């Protein structure tokens, strides 16, 4: 006989706070996971947006001057001609991920000057 999710939820609902804490600790130990990471990520989503330190530079459109955009992508990323062309042709595509704000703004300005449309996330 298998226990349903509803039965598990009912059993947890009847527990005291201390019993739930002990259950969570036992589950963390048994399965090798931590529940704290999920709580922090879910509770601090609004704060994370304000305190963002790493940004992704996304090429959303190439505009009318594809050659200039390819040159700008090569200069910004260090990719070879074939790789840069492939990246530009696959727009929207991530150019760089996890860069600081100053670098992201610099890349955006450089690519927009070449005619591309760029988004920073």
Swiss-Prot record:
The keyword Metal-binding does not apply. The keyword Ribonucleoprotein applies. SUPFAM superfamilies: ClpS-like, Ribosomal protein L7/12, oligomerisation (N-terminal) domain. One of its GO terms (molecular function) is structural constituent of ribosome. It comes from the Bacteria. Keywords: Ribonucleoprotein, Ribosomal protein. One of its GO terms (biological process) is translation. Belongs to the bacterial ribosomal protein bL12 family. This is Large ribosomal subunit protein bL12. It comes from Aliivibrio salmonicida (strain LFI1238) (Vibrio salmonicida (strain LFI1238)). The lineage of its organism: Bacteria, Pseudomonadati, Pseudomonadota, Gammaproteobacteria, Vibrionales.
């Amino acid at each position: 006989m298998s226990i349903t999710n509803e039965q598990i939820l009912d059993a947890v609902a009847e527990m005291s706070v201390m019993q739930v804490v002990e259950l969570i600790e036992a589950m963390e130990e048994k399965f090798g996971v931590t529940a704290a990471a999920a709580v922090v990520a879910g509770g601090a989503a609004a704060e994370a947006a304000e305190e963002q330190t790493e940004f992704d530079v996304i090429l959303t459109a190439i505009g009318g001057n594809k050659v200039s955009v390819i040159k700008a992508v090569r200069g910004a990323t260090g990719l070879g001609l074939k790789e840069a062309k492939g990246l530009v042709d696959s727009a929207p595509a991530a150019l760089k991920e996890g860069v600081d704000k100053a670098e992201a703004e610099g890349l955006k300005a450089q690519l927009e000057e070449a005619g591309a449309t760029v988004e920073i996330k």
